[in-house]
Amino acid sequence: PKKSAALTATLEFVKRVRSKDPGIGGMKLWLMYRNEFGTSQAFVGRDCFCAILSKYKLTIRKRFRAPRTTDSSHHLPQYPDLTRTLLLEHPDQLWVSDITYITIWLPDGSYVFCYLSLVTDAYTKEIIGYCVGDTLGSCYTVEALEMAVRRIAAKEIKGLIHHSDRGVQYASADYIAILRHNGILPSMTEDGNPKDNAIAERVNGIIKNELLQGMRFSSIQEVRKAVATAVHFYNNERPHMSLDMLTPVQAGEMQGPIRKRWISYREKYLNVALA
């Protein structure tokens, strides 16, 4: 009976979390499970937990990253990369932005795309601005930026950098004007290497290929509703290996370097070079 109760509790927990985050991996599931059931009689160990995921076909296949949605073939002003030697030490030091696409299926079986613009705090990994638009027009990236800016309206922020690719949306006069008006320094990648905007690319992938995994949308309204739910879960409940398994909201209370659950060779190099 005790084993049966533990199995039932474990399966119900996985089902509940996966209803909010269909693509969350086994390690994060295990850590969330341990936090919730660690002192309960229904608690099972890590190996048993992984065996349950495998037996009941609850493991997740890795997905490929989405194609880029950047058009940098324009003649608007571009800006140097200010992040190459930057070490993150506090919130609102660096924001990163990017765009990804989401498929909408039409009744006749054809499909169109809508586009999700995200602004993320690079230190906390919190999504602080987002907008879903039916085109790649700059008005949607502007709306995401305005959401992020409202967060800092009552704060005294100095030296905040906004980093993006060189897409026309981020180089547009309206977008740059908002950055300038709020004392935010524009920074852009210097080539097409996704690693130059890696945090933004990673967050795109988490939202699209993990939190929205397996969802089939028939309207942009459905996408907007699902994205709002996904962002709330991502910010408030999903632990991050890059944040020592804190959530982004929890990381917002931190100062100084946050321990990662892997080796960051970039940060290791910069710490030595700047010592």
Give the positions of each predicted feature.
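Basic, flexible linker segments flanking DNA-binding modules
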Residues: 1-91, 193, 249-258
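Residue-level detector of intrinsically disordered/flexible regions characterized by low predicted structural confidence
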Residues: 4-5, 30, 64, 197, ...
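Short, charged/polar low-complexity linear motifs in solvent-exposed/disordered segments
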Residues: 6, 11, 69, 78-79, ...
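Short secondary-structure junction motifs
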Residues: 24, 157-159, 238
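Sparse recognition of residues in long alpha-helices and their boundaries
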Residues: 30, 45, 65, 141, ...
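RNase H-like DDE/DDD metal-dependent nuclease/strand-transfer catalytic core used by mobile genetic elements
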Residues: 38-46, 51-60, 72-78, 82-228, ...
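C-terminal domain-tail junction helix/linker
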Residues: 180-184, 206-275
